[in-house]
């Protein structure tokens, strides 16, 4: 049964890819949805056996790579962390498959779409169940490939081509860091198996275990953790390598829901949680993680407030929430981070699928400024979007409230510079999150309509196959946090005993529960309320004042700064990409490939031999005394060298003769 959880999506993808022509669009949808749904049912059974009954399971299939000291096998590890991710991935993927049956019904290439969705799910399951870094890396690269295929599903659109290539290239940076981290792990531990590495982590955390670089020693565990974290930065869209995430909206909306809620972006958070025994012995790496996560949450929240594309606003909210998960790991509370990941999957999938219903009803229009007044036309979709938005901002007693507020309280009770930095940036991000969430609701559903009459006349609410996943996700967005809080992050729980590791000095969960002042606990709620009030005022009360501010010099520059995403794309394109392209052409291609390599290679050798042949041909004059003179000269030089060899060797290094000969050969070039 455990292996079927992983294999079933692969079978569905195989059937859709190779037999889609015979099964037809509806047959492919039924087969793939059935396979993923069965996988989700088995995941629920595995959750009961592994997590609730505390019975971790390890399955070793067969050896994979065996070479001298390097050994990697096909193995599957099912512990509490794994089964939580299995639940999230398979359930959300099942709902996305059901939703896509109706959403993609008019697309002629829907069999290919379902094939990609299923293979995406398979690679994510391979990633979370792997028992070694090599198998994890296989799933890691697989979800990158599947995301490229899904973002570029409508491959005739140039923007989809650009977005897919951008996602692939930016993730290559993070993947390179992860690959170096895996190599570092093997260098230190002589294995890539999680169980062996984590068991030996404390022994190798001493300062005398280091990597030597540029004659400087660097703590080995810290270097490995930083490199692994670079991989997470790329995959989980942290600041610096985040620019691919908003552009990934060029794919179909169900793809966005799957990428942002269950797969791809959650892989980085999962990997940090999986490697918690390593990160716990590297305080410096944890500080870096905390700062990067806090800055990401703040950056993405401020960027989302002035985006006009419906899906991009939700995409930046994903980026911001990932920042919360990352800095929760940075303050050594991996359980709360994974809990927030699970809660986030519910309301983020709900938001994206609700946005898909709006786009579907509005004839593929995504600009919120061209919507408005849809609450009366799409009451069901409006209710679903409202539930998702309230859960996102942490409205009391909804799912998001039980994890986001705990993360902020933990950051406050860390009592360190990094903890305070994360708390205040996270709290300010709550204000901006509330602002752009209510701005989205106002512009899309409550503001006076700006739509074309023909679009409004054809506007319709979600059909039944699209409504069922929305209803189930709405229940999850309301109740999951309340139902799972005590089990996953309650005081004294041993839910994570077989998967996560926290040093005793980093345990602050009990302190955050009882030592946090009441005013600190109320700050997120106050900021959420303030953000919603400001959003209402800006869009309904002081609209003329905002227009005057926006058209002023300062206001226009501020608007451009946030609307253009802090100019990250401009910096990357104008300074980094252009510089690398210029270097590649001027130096690598012209100076090296067509320059030095050609001179020292085929062109230079042929040119030199041709010139030498021309010079030697002049010696062949046809006169015997010329030949006799050359023979005498050569014999004299030969005898002189033999006789004076000891004297010459004393003054000239023999190894320089090769350089002299080569220089003589190329002296005429």
Swiss-Prot record:
GO CC entries: mitochondrial inner membrane
One Gene Ontology MF term: NADH dehydrogenase (ubiquinone) activity
Keyword Membrane listed: yes
InterPro entries the record matches: NADH_DH_su5_C (IPR010934), NADHpl_OxRdtase_5_subgr (IPR018393), ND/Mrp_TM (IPR001750), NU5C-like (IPR003945), Proton_antipo_N (IPR001516)
Subcellular compartments: Mitochondrion inner membrane
GO process terms (BP): ATP synthesis coupled electron transport
Pfam families, sorted: NADH5_C, Proton_antipo_M, Proton_antipo_N
Enzyme Commission code: 7.1.1.2
Topology relative to the membrane: Multi-pass membrane protein
Residues that span the membrane, as ranges: 3-23, 50-70, 81-100, 119-139, 178-198, 211-231, 253-273, 286-306, 322-342, 377-397, 423-443, 464-484, 522-542, 628-648, 649-669
Keywords, ordered alphabetically: Electron transport, Membrane, Mitochondrion, Mitochondrion inner membrane, NAD, Respiratory chain, Translocase, Transmembrane, Transmembrane helix, Transport, Ubiquinone
Top-level division of the source organism's lineage: Eukaryota
Reactions listed under catalytic activity: a ubiquinone + NADH + 5 H(+)(in) = a ubiquinol + NAD(+) + 4 H(+)(out)
Protein family per UniProt: Belongs to the complex I subunit 5 family.
NCBIfam families with a match to the protein in the record: NDH_I_L (TIGR01974), PRK06590.1 (NF005141)
Role summary: Core subunit of the mitochondrial membrane respiratory chain NADH dehydrogenase (Complex I) that is believed to belong to the minimal assembly required for catalysis. Complex I functions in the transfer of electrons from NADH to the respiratory chain. The immediate electron acceptor for the enzyme is believed to be ubiquinone.
Name of protein: NADH-ubiquinone oxidoreductase chain 5
Lineage: Eukaryota, Viridiplantae, Streptophyta, Embryophyta, Marchantiophyta
């Amino acid at each position: 049964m455990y292996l079927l959880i992983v294999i079933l999506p692969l079978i569905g993808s195989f059937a859709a890819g190779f037999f889609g022509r015979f099964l037809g669009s509806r047959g492919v949808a039924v087969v793939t949805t059935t396979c993923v749904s069965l996988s989700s049912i088995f995941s629920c059974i595995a959750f009961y056996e592994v997590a609730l009954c505390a019975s971790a399971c390890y399955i070793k299939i067969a050896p994979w790579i065996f070479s001298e000291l390097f050994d990697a096998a096909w193995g599957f590890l099912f512990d509490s962390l794994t089964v939580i991710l299995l639940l999230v991935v398979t359930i959300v993927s099942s709902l996305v498959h059901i939703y896509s049956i109706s959403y993609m019904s008019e697309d002629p290439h829907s069999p290919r779409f379902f094939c990609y969705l299923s293979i995406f799910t398979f690679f994510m399951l391979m990633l979370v169940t792997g028992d070694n870094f090599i198998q994890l890396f296989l799933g890691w690269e697989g979800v990158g490939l599947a995301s490229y295929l899904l973002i570029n599903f409508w491959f005739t659109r140039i923007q989809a081509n650009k977005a897919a290539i951008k996602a692939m290239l930016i993730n290559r940076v993070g993947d390179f860091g992860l690959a170096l981290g895996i190599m570092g792990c093997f260098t230190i531990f002589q294995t890539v198996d999680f169980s062996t590495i984590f068991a030996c982590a404390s022994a190798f955390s001493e300062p005398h275990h280091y990597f030597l670089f540029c004659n400087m020693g660097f703590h080995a565990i810290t270097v490995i953790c930083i490199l692994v974290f670079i991989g997470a930065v790329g995959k989980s869209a942290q600041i610096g390598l985040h620019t691919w995430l908003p552009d990934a909206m060029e794919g179909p909306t169900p793809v966005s829901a799957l990428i942002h809620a269950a797969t791809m972006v959650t892989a980085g958070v999962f990997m940090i949680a999986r490697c918690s025994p390593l990160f716990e012995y590297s305080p410096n790496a944890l500080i870096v993680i905390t700062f990067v996560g806090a800055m990401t949450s703040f950056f993405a929240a401020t960027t989302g407030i002035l985006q006009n594309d419906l899906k991009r606003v939700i995409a930046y909210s994903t980026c911001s929430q990932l920042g919360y998960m990352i800095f929760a790991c940075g303050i050594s509370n991996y359980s709360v981070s994974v809990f927030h990941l699970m809660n986030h999957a519910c309301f983020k999938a709900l938001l994206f699928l609700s946005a898909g219903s709006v786009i579907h009803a509005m004839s593929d229009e995504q600009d919120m400024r061209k919507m408005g007044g849809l609450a009366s036309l799409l009451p069901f979709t409006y209710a679903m979007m409202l539930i998702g938005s309230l859960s996102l901002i942490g409205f009391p007693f909804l799912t998001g409230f039980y994890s986001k507020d705990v993360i902020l309280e933990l950051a406050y009770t860390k009592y360190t510079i990094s903890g305070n930095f994360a708390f205040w940036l996270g709290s300010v991000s709550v204000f901006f999150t509330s602002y752009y969430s209510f701005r989205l609701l106002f512009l899309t559903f409550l503001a006076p309509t700006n739509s074309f009459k023909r679009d409004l006349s054809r506007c319709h609410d979600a059909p039944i196959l699209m409504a069922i996943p929305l209803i189930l996700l709405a229940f999850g967005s309301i109740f999951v946090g309340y139902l799972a809080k005590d089990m996953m992050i309650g005081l004294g729980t041993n839910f994570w005993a077989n998967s996560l590791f926290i040093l005793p000095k980093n345990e602050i969960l009990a302190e955050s529960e009882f030592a946090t002042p009441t005013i600190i606990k109320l700050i997120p709620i106050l900021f959420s309320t303030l953000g919603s009030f400001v959003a209402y005022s800006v869009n309904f009360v002081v609209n003329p004042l905002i227009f005057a501010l926006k058209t002023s010099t300062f206001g226009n520059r501020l608007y451009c700064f946030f609307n253009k995403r802090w100019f990250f794309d401009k910096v990357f394109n104008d300074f980094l990409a252009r510089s690398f392209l210029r270097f590649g052409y001027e130096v690598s291609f012209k100076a090296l490939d067509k320059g030095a390599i050609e001179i020292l290679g085929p062109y230079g050798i042929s040119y030199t031999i041709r010139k030498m042949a021309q010079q030697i041909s002049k010696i062949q004059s046809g006169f015997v005394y010329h030949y006799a003179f050359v023979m005498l000269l050569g014999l004299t030089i030969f005898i002189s060298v033999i006789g004076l060899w000891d004297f010459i060797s004393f003054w000239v290094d023999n190894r320089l003769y090769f350089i002299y000969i080569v220089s003589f050969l190329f002296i005429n070039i």
